[in-house]
Amino acid sequence: MPRSVNHVASRAKRKRILKLTRGYYGARKNVWTVAKNTWEKGLTYAFRDRRNKKRNFRALWIQRINAAARMEGLSYSRLMGALHAAGIEINRKVLADLAVNHPEAFKAIVAKVK
């Protein structure tokens, strides 16, 4: 009995991966083994960077709040401590947005905790 091989499924799998690697440079887009490895590595990077994105944004918010707070004569840590002591529960994302887009609202918050 001859060996049965499912070429249809194999070809479909290869085609699917090669479709996902469209736009990559060189052999990464059209050589099956290289494309497969590149695609898998891309998934690894995506997984890692979904977590790093959260850190990076938090760091960005802190930098923006710190810059705006220093213009008002406070450091970031003193501002956050004062906000906590005053019972003002506003997260860093919103505070950074206020500092950048609505500086008068940010100044009002700082004036409240000074």
Swiss-Prot record:
GO terms for biological process: ribosomal large subunit assembly; translation. CDD domains: Ribosomal_L20. The keyword Ribonucleoprotein applies. The keyword Membrane does not apply. Keywords: Ribonucleoprotein, Ribosomal protein, RNA-binding, rRNA-binding. PROSITE patterns: RIBOSOMAL_L20. One of its GO terms (molecular function) is rRNA binding. Binds directly to 23S ribosomal RNA and is necessary for the in vitro assembly process of the 50S ribosomal subunit. It is not involved in the protein synthesizing functions of that subunit. Belongs to the bacterial ribosomal protein bL20 family. HAMAP family: Ribosomal_bL20. This is Large ribosomal subunit protein bL20. It comes from Parabacteroides distasonis (strain ATCC 8503 / DSM 20701 / CIP 104284 / JCM 5825 / NCTC 11152).
